[in-house]
From Swiss-Prot:
An example molecular function term from Gene Ontology annotations: DNA binding
UniProt KW Transcription regulation keyword: yes
Protein name: Transcription elongation factor GreA
SUPFAM superfamilies from the UniProt entry: FKBP-like (SSF54534), GreA transcript cleavage protein, N-terminal domain (SSF46557)
Top-level taxon of origin: Bacteria
Family: Belongs to the GreA/GreB family.
Record InterPro entries: GreA/GreB_C_sf, TF_GreA/GreB_CS, Tscrpt_elong_fac_GreA, Tscrpt_elong_fac_GreA/B, Tscrpt_elong_fac_GreA/B_C, Tscrpt_elong_fac_GreA/B_fam, Tscrpt_elong_fac_GreA/B_N, Tscrpt_elong_fac_GreA/B_N_sf
Keywords from the named record: DNA-binding, Transcription, Transcription regulation
GO biological process terms on file: DNA-templated transcription elongation; regulation of DNA-templated transcription elongation
Function per UniProt: Necessary for efficient RNA polymerase transcription elongation past template-encoded arresting sites. The arresting sites in DNA have the property of trapping a certain fraction of elongating RNA polymerases that pass through, resulting in locked ternary complexes. Cleavage of the nascent transcript by cleavage factors such as GreA or GreB allows the resumption of elongation from the new 3'terminus. GreA releases sequences of 2 to 3 nucleotides.
One Pfam match: GreA_GreB_N
PANTHER family (UniProt xref): TRANSCRIPTION ELONGATION FACTOR GREA
Length: 160
């Protein structure tokens, strides 16, 4: 994350581009139409439809600017094209075992916007991801959690 660049996987970039396209081609025109319709209803001071549409327009325009900024600062990293030699890096899929409970979990380390714990995608800035970066299979990490220290062993690293 040097030079203001934001790391992102190719899938993360694709998802942002799809959202941006939807906002510009579908959402923006629909809200412009809704504002025009609400304006036709007369007095704008007491026109709830108009004010709601304007508020929605502000939200959409804000999100468009946010996505455009993220894409312009994105450093797309395709982990399949890197020579990491078994080391955990951004984009890697890492399988760990909780040493105490023997519970095995697999995570992919992704950009902040891509993080989705339900799909086992953790942000590169998350404490677990930061602890895993530059480690290899067989290494153990100790993570401070609200319930105390947890030790994980890295059992697999994939680049997919």
């Amino acid at each position: 994350m040097t030079n203001g660049r934001v790391p992102m996987t190719p899938a993360g970039e694709q998802a942002l581009r799809a959202e941006l396209s939807r906002l510009k081609k579908t959402e923006r025109p629909a809200i412009i139409e809704a504002i025009a319709e609400a304006r036709d209803h007369g007095d704008l001071k007491e026109n709830a439809e108009y004010h709601a549409a304007r508020e929605r327009q502000g939200i959409i325009e804000g999100r468009i600017k946010d996505i455009e900024s993220k894409l312009s600062n994105a450093q797309v990293i395709d982990v399949t094209k890197l020579q990491a030699n078994g080391m955990v890096i951004f984009g890697a899929t890492v399988t760990v075992i909780n040493v105490d409970t023997e519970e095995e979990t697999t995570y992919q380390i992704v950009g902040e916007d891509e993080a989705d714990i339900d799909n086992h995608k953790i942000s590169v800035v998350a404490p677990l991801a930061r602890a895993l970066i530059k480690k290899e299979v067989g290494d153990e990490i100790i993570l401070d959690t609200p319930k105390g220290k947890v030790t994980y062993e890295i059992v697999d690293v994939e680049y997919k």
